[in-house]
Amino acid sequence: MAMASAACSCTDGTWWVYALPALLGSDTLCAHPALLAGLIFLATVSVALLAWATSPGGPAWTNGRGASASLLSWDPVVCPCSAASSRCPGAAAPRPRRDGPRRRPRAKELMAFSVGDTPAVVSSCPATAREVLAHPSFADRPVKRSARELMFARAIGFAPNGEYWRRLRRVASTHLFSPRRVASHEPGRQGDAEAMLRSIAAEQSASGAVALRPHLQAAALNNIMGSVFGTRYDVTSGAGAAEAEHLKSMVREGFELLGAFNWSDHLPWLAHLYDPSNVTRRCAALVPRVQTFVRGVIDEHRRRRQNSAALNDNADFVDVLLSLEGDEKLGDDDMVAILWEMVFRGTDTTALLTEWCMAELVRHPAVQARVRAEVDAAVGAGGCPTDADVARMPYLQAVVKETLRAHPPGPLLSWARLATADVPLCNGMVVPAGTTAMVNMWAITHDAAVWADPDAFAPERFLPSEGGADVDVRGVDLRLAPFGAGRRVCPGKNLGLTTVGLWVARLVHAFQWALPDGAAAVCLDEVLKLSLEMKTPLVAAAIPRTA
């Protein structure tokens, strides 16, 4: 019935084709049989194209795909270019339809739609999302053209499921992001925080307010550079500032290319005809710059290791990769891809999440005061919070979790999954092989059936001592899984959470944060690029507590 109704509705738009014979007259048509044949052909093609484009789920679900997915809920408003807007740079974050579950209860579990020739499903239900993220047939990711050309197909994020990817995952969990390795880099995180606090104090003194994001991005860049390459930049000096700006420009270009919507990913025949973002040309220009930079760092570390091959606890990622032997040993091309991905993924995500935290603390002075009191109780007014201190601050941890709930960095868990086989789900639905699957984490974290009063910023919801839930955000509980779950969970999640927690503690401990003079409110409008960003970067008054 759904297929029939869709077909009926699509023919309504072709009325003009059938009206043409009446307008032209029978004599004209009889005298020109070629014109009559052309009109019949035009009418047939018009009906076929519209039926194809407006079929349940959209055009990608034709050609038999829909037969194996007959229990899916179809998006009734999909057309060939539907869903593109939510993936375009600068698009608003995907919002759930508040009345969707009431009108179409199964749509929340799994909704089918099309992006060009790509069949896709999206889940806004924690139980179904867990199946999508944890099922072994969803262990692959669809590789965008930009990701492939930027070498990410050989890195942890996009490498296909197989022996090579399993080796990368083992190296990441055992060597790069182990608890001991994360702890060993704390002095670097503290140093980056100190430099950030000094630059914030200087801008506050000079301008009376602080644009926070550039300070966070500079600190995040140095932090990830220290962890990955063992290098930090003095951005106040000419040489250091120039090299840091060069690296930032490469990271920024990579973010734009990977976050840009490219129609050739979904209509391959457009690859050489339509590339409005110049993805191919820009990737071809960026890759040699990245290779030159990263290979130079690898060569320098290799020369250094000739004198001392010993690997200490605070070794950077390059040294760790160079120390691998046997089956774990990697070639230079693979190391370039892995190291570049680490820099790329670890820079803006940390900065943007910290900015969201601080924006909410500016909006909620009582929450900020409670965080500050918790930090002061741990280290005193003149102390310096450490990673160990932050781990014992339940309210600060709750603030970070609530920020992740209110503003999930990847609202559509941006890097989707690809079904490598037909996947039957517990609810009776079947996701066919070749389908791209996504989880709408924004919809889940703002669903009143999952979270009480979801539009309120309430860290207490994560405090068991105050009636809240002790939710693990590292992929265990799909009510809040901002780093993904299953085999493709983000390997750097612990490093990211540790860094954000420490920096929020340092920022609140050093400054009283408030709206600058003349500002009415913090703007929480969102923009979806590769991550969910504040559309208007936070500007606040950072009043030193010693003043």
From Swiss-Prot:
Q: Where is this region: Disordered?
A: 84-104
Cofactor(s) essential for the protein: heme
Tissue and organ distribution: Shoot apex.
Q: Where does heme bind?
A: 490
Answer whether the UniProt record assigns the keyword Transferase to this protein.
no
Keyword Cell membrane annotated: no
* EC supergroup of this enzyme: oxidoreductase
What EC number(s) does this enzyme carry? 1.14.-.-
InterPro entries given for it?
A: Cyt_P450, Cyt_P450_CS, Cyt_P450_E_grp-I, Cyt_P450_sf, Cytochrome_P450_78A
From which domain of life does this come?
Answer: Eukaryota
Similarity comment: Belongs to the cytochrome P450 family.
| Protein name as catalogued | Cytochrome P450 78A1
Q: Which organism is it from?
A: Zea mays
| Gene that encodes it | CYP78A1
